[in-house]
Amino acid sequence: MNAHGLSAEKLKIKPQKILIIGTLGSGKTTVAQRLARDTGFPYTSIDDCRIRYGDGTMYGEEHAWDHFLAICRKPAPGILEFCGMGPNVEEVRDDLLLSRIPVSVIWLVLPLDTCIARASKRQRKIPFPFPWAPIAYSVPLIHDEIEFAWDSIWSREPHFHATRQEFSGTASVDEMYSAIREICSSPE
């Protein structure tokens, strides 16, 4: 049970790994943390691993990914979050498969201008070994890379329940959360 008296059973969410992906400002962290709170499943993001284990160097980045991938492999339910693309995407997929428990992959898709506006308001600094490009450039680029990874990896894996969930730019967190909770509760 969580602080709101809800449990994974009450939410009708079977034990599974739930990977939330999306570009900067898409609401991944907000939705994933709320889902973790309401299910009792542990939450892990690559950014949290970077903060905890990284130091802004390549070694720190590798160390952060080692921890994130170990959690992907672990045969236990969890709520996971990263953008869903990049050089480690195939390792994430492979390690999720190694966990041998059901996996739902949910891509949060919002209008890019909404994501740019949200990401531009952030103050949080994440240790990362490469310089960040301006948000207005990064958001569409990341979206395009996720699109490629979605078509070539996430939606093609038959052992994953993969859902591309699109929202309007005015969708509230509650609307997004309700849709994600429904996806995770659905029988495969």
Positions of PLM-derived features:
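Conserved substrate/cofactor phosphate-moiety recognition/catalytic segment
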Residues: 30-76
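Small-molecule kinase domains that catalyze NTP-dependent phosphoryl transfer to phosphate-bearing small molecules
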Residues: 125-183, 187-188
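Conserved phosphate-donor/acceptor-positioning beta-strand/loop module used by diverse small-molecule
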Residues: 99-122
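Pre-Walker A adenine-sensing motif
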Residues: 2-11
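Hydrophobic anchor at the beta1->P-loop junction of P-loop NTPases
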Residues: 20
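Conserved glycine(s) of the Walker
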Residues: 27
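The conserved Walker
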Residues: 24
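Structural recognition of the conserved hydrophobic beta-strand(s) that form the central parallel beta-sheet
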Residues: 78-83
